[in-house]
Curated annotation (Swiss-Prot):
It is found in: Host cytoplasm; Host nucleus. GO terms for biological process: viral RNA genome replication; viral translational frameshifting. The record marks K202, K203, K206 as: Important for efficient shutoff activity. The active site is at E80, D108. It comes from Influenza A virus (strain A/Chicken/Hong Kong/96.1/2002 H5N1 genotype Y). This is Protein PA-X. One of its GO terms (molecular function) is RNA binding.
Amino acid sequence: MEDFVRQCFNPMIVELTEKAMKEYGEDPKIETNKFAAICTHLEVCFMYSDFHFIDERSESIIVESGDPNALLKHRFEIIEGRDRTMAWTVVNSICNTTGVEKPKFIPDLYDYKENRFIEIGVTRREVHTYYLEKANKIKSEKTHIHIFSFTGEEMATKADYTLDEESRARIKTRLFTIRQEMASRGLWDSFVNPREAKRQLKKNLKSLEPCADLPTKVSHRTSPALKTLEPMWMDSNRTAALRASFLKCQKK
């Protein structure tokens, strides 16, 4: 699973996920299913935001090839993927600027058009069940919830799906592709079955014990079969801006 994740996802997604897991004392090499789940969730958050802007009249527009002369602002602020301190700093800044109610938990996005925080969910289970779990945890009508599944289903607060149908279809297609590729490699069952995942976790722990201190050699080559999985949703300018925004505070 770890090899699949590193080949399947954008390197920046992988890097941010590793930092997030280490912040909570988790090891991507051991908890590989969680590694895959967090990478998937983070990519969906980026896809949700990509190409969506607000123009000088505060109207929402979609731009896939940037016009440098256009006065555009990204419609969504991406909060997911930042360390906790920086995430709360962004949330507090948004609340102070807009006057919206501060959430109890760190949300994933902020929508400048609708003036609301958004909680994104990606589930391997039934969307209604996961939606209720999210709603019960958040306990706030102010935070909008949008759930996606690997089977193409979705559910959102008051059936308000925020994005246009084409943008949501890109996300659903990507999730379905990830599912199919996992299944073709025999990874899907352990990804969705907690009992099988627990068995795999024990296996990972056992395999790491004898050689924990040995250096490892990592191959960054992408197999031909996985080249079709390379995410195409992030333009180079957006990637550079996001990398600078998320990672500049790592250096002292």
